[in-house]
């Protein structure tokens, strides 16, 4: 088994709000990965005294512990429990009903021995890639936000009306009920040669800049590693800035990648 992990802040002046980790049981069989992309709130009050990095670390750590200690629980249940536990930690000090309370996108994967399935869960716009033994790559996506008309997301206020709301998009915040909206499933272990989890700061190599396909993206990870893909993203971002003086998107975003060959 080969596992690589890398993460990079979008700016040295701001804390990295992405979070990534992997757990490998002492038995030597199986494992779990968690990748979170913390949602950066606009300036102003968002009801919490802790902040997004605190939230992603709390939620991520709880997810990792539950993923390997509650093997019989489906990942949707693991996520619901982790959201509830994290909310309980600051329920008495923060306004968890605020629409901008700290929240994150989620990618989870868990695998056992050769006869067991690879389980997956994706909530919001991070991505999980599954590679078959033949080399085909399947992207597991929760594309709700991409299907929304751009004009509905043009302002923070209009996006807030769609956040964790029917007809909009969902993130892991304080309501464990959002887990019913996650994209979850199972794949026979024998049909998964490798997997990769990417926040949108890394997946923009494919989705925004169209530098390659998902299959080519996984090929970069295999040859150059997780940091190699992030380095490619940073190079493309810089080149894009040099070509134009008008940037309509965040130049550098936090990026996190986990790559695992099973």
Predicted regions and their residues:
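PP2C/PPM-type serine/threonine phosphatase catalytic domain
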Residues: 1-262
